[in-house]
């Protein structure tokens, strides 16, 4: 345990000195991309990966920032006679280097999957005990990202040290290849990953698997909202369940290492538009990776416009990299069909002195919500200048793309693509530094010194705002 504390302390010292704590120089902002699992599970093929990559480029999503195309489980054909991983040639007839080349030709990055166990979660060969050989396989095929799961781990868990050592073996092996490979742990938050993840990885899952439900309880996700040290993470965890578990963990994330709340369910299942906006907004607020889980070939216009909302993405990609904090949480009487209902207020600092705030309405009706500057700057002492200043308030969803424009883009109208923010020409960091109006939403008013912001938030919805000093 001492070694873990030392590693954590080292990361904190590096942060204090202004040195990136990223163990491999990657992940200075949360990763963005696409993963097949939420929609396609094991139904993966070369055609799916290449077609998705083409579609991401055609729609302008690559330029918005979604640059990783990640192949999940079920790609493997086993191991060769010398123990090397081989792809299933029925699914990937040209091999993995062919896929990587196609993606790289489009300036996209290629992600693959394995598990820190004897088998992957779907029963294919895992990498436990094969870390060096498998890392060489990934590097040889020019993989840029590894999602590393937790199934069939032979009982090598139960303490932070046990899990740390098991995942460190692949971290070391990836580094030994000499190829920069983003390392994404998927150990479901087991053994307090948020304490030690940043020493060996760029992101780490902090809960059981997500499902496309806003706040539905499920016995397969047995740990409650506040059980951040969950002994049995399970799966089918709702959006609110995961968000509430993540609330205390923001203090352990920073550039180079992020809490991963799992893939986005925008465009998956039957979430309402307000639920999809709330889901996307809160993942951005807590600096979770933004990984599309939907079929990009069959996105509805409203979901596409959420994925393309650059003022919200700019919060997620803010170079300061400080996750927002949940300031308060209150239960409400207007519960849904599952007896669930709560409201929350979140706030966090941004690189340029701005502040981002979110009013989250988990209740079953539209409601007024409000917060004062003492809520927004909850750590400030009485008399602090931020409490005695005037702040301009910008609604980060006010300039959302119209469905008609989104439909034009989805139907191949390239001229409409020019309406999307292009982070390949100007990064979010550069755009924020240059006060690019496309990243700030629309001003809706001001908060005077000592004043309050009053908003109306739909059921299962969010009000998301950026505050700028007047």
Curated annotation (Swiss-Prot):
The active site is at 149 (nucleophile), 209 (proton donor). Glycans are attached at residues 43, 82, 175, 270, 388, 413, 422, 435, 454. It is an enzyme of class 3 (hydrolase). It holds the Pfam family Melibiase_2. GO terms for molecular function: alpha-galactosidase activity. It is found in: Secreted. PANTHER family: ALPHA-GALACTOSIDASE MEL1, ALPHA-GALACTOSIDASE/ALPHA-N-ACETYLGALACTOSAMINIDASE. Belongs to the glycosyl hydrolase 27 family. This is Alpha-galactosidase. It comes from Zygotorulaspora mrakii.
């Amino acid at each position: 345990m001492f070694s873990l504390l030392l590693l954590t302390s080292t990361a904190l010292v590096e942060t204090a000195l202004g040195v990136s704590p990223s163990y491999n120089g990657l992940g200075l902002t949360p990763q963005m991309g696409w993963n097949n699992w939420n929609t396609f599970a094991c139904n993966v093929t070369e055609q799916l990966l290449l077609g998705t990559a083409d579609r991401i480029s055609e729609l302008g999503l690559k330029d918005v920032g979604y640059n990783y195309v990640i192949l999940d489980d079920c790609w493997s054909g086993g191991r060769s006679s010398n123990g090397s991983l081989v792809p299933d040639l029925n699914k990937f007839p040209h091999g993995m280097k062919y896929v990587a080349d196609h993606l790289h030709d489009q300036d996209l990055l290629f992600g693959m999957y394995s598990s820190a166990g004897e088998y992957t979660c779907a029963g294919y060969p895992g990498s436990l005990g094969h870390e060096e050989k498998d890392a060489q396989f990934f590097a040889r095929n020019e993989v840029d990202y590894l999602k590393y799961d937790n199934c069939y781990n032979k009982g090598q868990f139960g303490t932070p040290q046990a899990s740390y050592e098991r995942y460190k073996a692949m971290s070391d092996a990836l580094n030994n290849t000499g190829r920069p490979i983003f390392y994404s742990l998927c150990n479901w938050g087991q053994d307090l990953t948020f304490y030690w993840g940043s020493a060996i990885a760029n992101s780490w899952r902090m809960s059981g698997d997500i499902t496309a439900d806003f706040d539905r309880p499920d016995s397969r996700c047995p740990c409650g909202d506040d059980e951040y040290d969950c002994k049995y993470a399970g799966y089918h965890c709702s959006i609110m369940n995961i968000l509430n578990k993540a609330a205390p963990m923001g203090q352990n994330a920073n550039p180079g290492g992020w809490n991963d709340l799992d893939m986005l369910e925008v465009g998956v299942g039957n979430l309402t538009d307000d639920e999809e906006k709330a889901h996307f907004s809160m993942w951005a607020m807590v600096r979770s990776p933004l990984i599309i889980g939907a079929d990009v070939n069959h996105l509805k216009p409203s979901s596409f416009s959420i994925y393309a909302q650059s003022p919200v993405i700019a919060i997620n990609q803010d170079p300061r990299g400080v996750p927002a904090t949940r300031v308060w949480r209150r239960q409400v009487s207007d519960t849904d069909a599952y007896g669930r209902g709560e409201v929350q207020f979140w706030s966090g600092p941004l690189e340029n002195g701005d502040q981002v705030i979110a009013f989250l309405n988990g209740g079953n009706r539209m409601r007024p919500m409000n917060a004062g500057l003492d809520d927004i700057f909850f750590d400030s002492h009485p008399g602090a200048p931020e409490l005695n200043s005037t702040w301009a308030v910008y609604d980060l969803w006010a300039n959302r793309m119209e469905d008609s424009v989104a439909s034009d883009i989805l139907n191949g109208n390239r001229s409409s693509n020019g309406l999307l923010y292009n982070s390949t020409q100007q990064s979010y960091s550069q755009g924020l530094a240059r006060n690019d109006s496309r990243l700030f939403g629309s001003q809706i008013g001001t908060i005077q010194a000592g004043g309050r912001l009053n908003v109306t938030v739909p059921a299962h919805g969010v009000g998301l705002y950026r505050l700028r000093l007047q």
